[in-house]
Every structure is written in structure tokens, then in C-alpha cells.
Regions:
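N-terminal accessory regions of nucleic-acid-interacting proteins
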Residues: 1-13, 18-20
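Glycine-rich, highly charged phosphate/nucleotide-binding loops
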Residues: 75-84
Length: 193
């Protein structure tokens, strides 16, 4: 993506889940949206959006989900449903290029929007930063956010699997994914002979 993009919207979602796959993939629901608006020229954060979302298909969070995300049943029980959060996210990200680390977040937004009978809040334009980072690094395979942070010499901040913290960490990788900073060569575990 060129530097002519005015703003990037980094989105990270957390969704209902369980360790035994009792919740079918097409029934997972967003429980937290973390989004960071980033200036396209400077790549500096401009503003944040963060909201818990109350699930309706599987309203009770599994113990695994709570352990993984640190999101409690109380957090989501008091939250608005996706139908009410989606327009706020759309307004927040208006005219920005929607970005996420991988395709999952885009697919989950589309799935929740379909379930509610509403339009996808962020439209069709999407930049998969996981793919962009792999291309910039010259890698054939993609890596997770934390592995990418370590590769460029950054320490992860915040709590992993929390929407806004993960969005902030992804934003720190934006200059590398866009090719504005070089991605260091991957280190190997092999020792020189």
C-alpha cells in the first residue's frame, strides 16, 4: 500500500471460543473489538476504539475463552451487541484502510454482520498485514504477531489476546509490513561450525 493512504485502521478482534471445538466456527461471535487509527504519512497512532461485545448465539463464555482472553462474563454481559457496536466502529474507521494481522478478523466481522442482517462495518477494502509482513521479509510462510515483533527486535506490550493491546502491537509492525523499515533476516537456531 502506498504512503498516499491517509489513514490505516488496525483492527484486532477477540471472539467466543472453546478448546474442544464445541462452538462451531460459523457460530463464533466477536466479544471484543480493538481498533487503532493510524496516520498514513507518519504511521503515528491518532485515536483508539475499544468495545466489549455481548454474544447472543453462545452468550456464556467458556472457561477456556476467559483464560485465553482475560475477558470475563461480566465484561460481555454489560456490553452492547454487535448490531449496536458495528455502526460505531464504521464511523470510527470511516475512510481509513481496514488492516488486520491475517484474514481472520475480516472474516469474523463479515460473519457477525451477516448474522445480524447488517452491512459489514468496514467495507470491502482490507490489507492483510500478516501477508504484507511476510512479503516484506521475503518469507514463504507467515508468522504470528509476537514472532514478528521479536524478529524486528520489539517486545510485545500489553496482554496477548486483548483486542486493543494486540491492535497496538500490530501498529508497531506497520512500518515493516509496508516496507518503510527493513525486516531483519530470520535468525536460525543453527550455530556456525
Amino acid at each position: 500500500m502506498s504512503s498516499s493512504t491517509h489513514r490505516y485502521l488496525i483492527v484486532d478482534l477477540e471472539a467466543t471460543c472453546d478448546e474442544h471445538h464445541e462452538i462451531p466456527r460459523d457460530e463464533t461471535e466477536i466479544i471484543e473489538i480493538g481498533a487503532l487509527l493510524v496516520d498514513g504519512a507518519t504511521l503515528a497512532p491518532i485515536e483508539e476504539f475499544n468495545s466489549f461485545v455481548r454474544p447472543v448465539v453462545h452468550p456464556r463464555l467458556t472457561e477456556f475463552c476467559t483464560r485465553l482472553t482475560t475477558i470475563s462474563q461480566e465484561d460481555v454481559a454489560r456490553a452492547p451487541t454487535f448490531r449496536f457496536v458495528a455502526p460505531k466502529l464504521a464511523a470510527f474507521g470511516q475512510d481509513a484502510l481496514f488492516c488486520s494481522w491475517g484474514a481472520y478478523d475480516r472474516s469474523q466481522l463479515e460473519r457477525d454482520a451477516r448474522r445480524c442482517g447488517i452491512r459489514t462495518p468496514l467495507g470491502p477494502r482490507h490489507l492483510n498485514l500478516k501477508e504484507a509482513f511476510a512479503r516484506a521479509a521475503g518469507d514463504r510462510s507467515e508468522c504470528g504477531t509476537y514472532a514478528a515483533l521479536r524478529r524486528v527486535g520489539l517486545t510485545p506490550d500489553g496482554t496477548h489476546h486483548r483486542g486493543i493491546d494486540d491492535a497496538r502491537n500490530i501498529a508497531r509492525l506497520l512500518p515493516y509490513a509496508l516496507g518503510r523499515l527493513p525486516v531483519p533476516a530470520a535468525r536460525t537456531d543453527r550455530r556456525p561450525r
